[in-house]
């Protein structure tokens, strides 16, 4: 474990408003003058890390509790009745969680976290939007892991960080992991595991930036971050959208930095502890908090790593809905079929299938079919699959289209019981095909063509109203008629902005007893927006799919396709289910899969009526 000097502590436990409005230095007892790491606690108490012990110290300087440990690095988050803290045990190279009971004056060592498999250079905590606590363990050569705290420690993901990290801290409100890299500077990474760990430079050393020296400590500010450099100067940066603005540095000769909550800091200098008045103006505010619903089930991962899974569909067993099937495309392999427990029941090697949609009880003369239609990207064709009474699929036809780079599809059951299919091209073109059957074979007749300005993918047809919803990925959600004898005049429902964050992806329609809802994947912020499916298409809200640590199911993010059904599938799905593609399979890392959410959970979160 690398020695960490002047480690920065995030102790956001004093009342933020009070701390931000006052520059008075808290009374630091003389007994804490030489402590290696310090955190301010409610009621004037302190948590101090010395060379051989973690100590709980009262406002009067008296020691209330001591935990013998040779450790470095201290971080914490508030909990009922106290705080949850972590330190890095120098003897075992493991993270040691500690529960601090302020009323009883007790430090309780919790079970140590598992070995990371590398020496620890830094560790920091993160509290996500669900209120779940995580720990980032950072080692040499860019090795890092994210773990979930709780009654059972779970590895959430492995991630690559810079090769020589000395400090880390997390801005919970913005889901941002800050890491200081020796010889390079300060970086910001995404802390939310449900997404890519792309990095953004905050401040870099020459020749890449203007940072003058090494960073010796970090503290999170509202919409910003502060640091001490090797000269003891206080540095601050304000968040400005996706970039960072450096503010004038202050020469304080600081040796240690403590965050007091809000925009209040405390710096240990040769003249003693100071609380510099920052006159801080918060940077870009945190995104709007959305309700979080937990998945009830996840499918087995697809066989290929990378961007493989894409779009689900649901086949409802008319005799026993609990025996229904979930179809899912694998863009590198073919069609997958799952039961409602997420177990794979069938695989059809149909090639690079992108989107799929299902319609049931279709009428072709005296014949009745349940059919799935998928887009085949190598052939620019539609692949038709029949579905038998047990949910078994069989390829029935490959129908050519006039598209050059086929992408998405959705289907429409006409009032007469026929099947229409809409397919689109990356150049914005849509083709509307009427599926035919003659001589025991399926065919297709081109009925209409229309176009959006830029790349589309997701679409959904409402069999009841005859409306077709079309997503233009980077631009807007549109609506037109799904009927072949009507003009395809596009009317805008909503542009990308407050609710929809590009890309606009999967879509599905939920038919309740009295209300129908359109669900749209807002891929850019990993959320799902719910609209009324009838004009004026009022927004009913948005939600995210979080993780269920007890069941061991991670959340869903960067969703491509989705499907929703109001059928009674039994158990938690009595009011139906939503199935979504998960772009990042975590806890642990694996190939992509699909998640199922009970509609009842969504309805309760957004207060939706049936």
Language model region names:
Residues 1-20:
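Gram-negative bacterial Sec-dependent N-terminal signal peptides
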Residues 20-610:
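Sequence/structural signature of beta-propeller domains
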């Amino acid at each position: 474990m690398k020695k960490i000097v002047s480690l920065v502590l995030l102790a956001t436990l004093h009342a933020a408003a009070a701390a931000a409005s006052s520059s008075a230095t808290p009374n630091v007892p003389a007994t804490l003058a030489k402590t290696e790491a310090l955190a301010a606690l409610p009621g004037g108490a302190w948590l101090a890390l010395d060379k051989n012990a973690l100590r709980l110290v009262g406002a009067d300087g008296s020691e209330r509790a001591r935990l013998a440990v040779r450790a470095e690095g201290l971080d914490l988050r508030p909990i009922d009745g106290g705080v949850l803290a972590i330190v890095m045990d120098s003897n075992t190279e493991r993270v040691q969680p500690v529960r601090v009971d302020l009323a009883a004056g007790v430090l309780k060592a919790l079970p140590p976290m598992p070995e990371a498999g590398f020496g620890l250079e830094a560790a920091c905590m993160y509290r996500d939007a669900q209120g779940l606590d995580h720990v980032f363990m950072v080692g040499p050569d860019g090795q890092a892991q994210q773990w979930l705290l709780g009654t059972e420690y779970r590895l959430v993901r492995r991630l690559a960080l810079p090769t020589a990290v000395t400090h880390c801290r997390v801005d919970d409100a913005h889901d941002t992991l800050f890491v200081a890299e020796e010889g390079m500077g300060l970086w910001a990474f995404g802390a939310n595991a449900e997404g890519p760990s792309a990095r953004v430079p905050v401040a870099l050393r020459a020749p890449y930036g203007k940072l003058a020296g090494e960073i010796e400590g970090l503290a999170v500010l509202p919409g910003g971050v502060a640091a001490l450099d090797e000269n003891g100067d206080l540095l601050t940066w304000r968040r400005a959208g996706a970039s960072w603005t450096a503010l004038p540095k202050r020469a304080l000769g600081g040796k240690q930095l403590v965050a007091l909550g809000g925009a209040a800091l405390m710096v240990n200098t040769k003249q003693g502890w100071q609380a510099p008045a920052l006159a801080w103006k918060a940077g870009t505010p945190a995104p709007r908090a959305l309700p979080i619903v937990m998945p009830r089930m996840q499918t087995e991962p697809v066989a290929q790593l990378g961007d493989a899974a894409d779009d689900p569909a649901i086949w409802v067993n008319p005799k026993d809905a609990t025996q229904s099937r979930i179809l899912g495309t694998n863009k590198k392999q073919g069609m997958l079929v799952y039961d409602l427990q997420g177990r794979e029941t069938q695989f059809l090697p149909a090639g690079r299938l992108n989107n799929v949609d299902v319609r049931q009880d279709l009428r072709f003369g005296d014949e009745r079919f349940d059919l799935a239609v998928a887009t085949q990207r190598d052939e620019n064709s539609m692949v038709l699959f029949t579905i038998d009474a047990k949910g078994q699929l069989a390829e029935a036809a490959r129908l050519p289209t006039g598209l050059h780079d086929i992408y998405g599809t959705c289907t429409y059951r006409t009032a007469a019981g026929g099947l229409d299919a809409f397919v689109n091209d990356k150049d914005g073109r849509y083709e509307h095909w009427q599926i035919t059957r003659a001589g025991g074979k399926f065919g297709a007749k081109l009925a209409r063509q229309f176009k959006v300005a830029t790349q589309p993918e997701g679409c959904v047809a409402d069999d009841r109203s005859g409306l077709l919803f079309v997503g233009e990925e980077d631009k807007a959600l549109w609506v037109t008629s799904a009927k072949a004898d009507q003009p395809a005049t596009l009317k805008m429902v909503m542009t990308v902005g407050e609710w929809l964050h590009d890309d606009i992806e999967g879509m599905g329609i939920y038919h309740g007893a009295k209300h129908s809802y359109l669900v749209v994947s807002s891929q850019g912020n990993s959320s799902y927006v719910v609209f009324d499916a009838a004009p004026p298409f009022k927004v009913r809200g948005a939600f995210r799919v979080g993780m269920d640590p007890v069941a061991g199911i991670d959340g869903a993010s960067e969703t491509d396709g989705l499907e929703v059904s109001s059928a009674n599938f039994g158990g938690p799905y009595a009011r139906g289910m939503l199935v979504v593609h998960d772009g990042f399979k975590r806890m642990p890392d694996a190939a992509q899969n699909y998640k199922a959410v009970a509609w009842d959970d969504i309805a309760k979160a957004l207060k939706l009526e049936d």
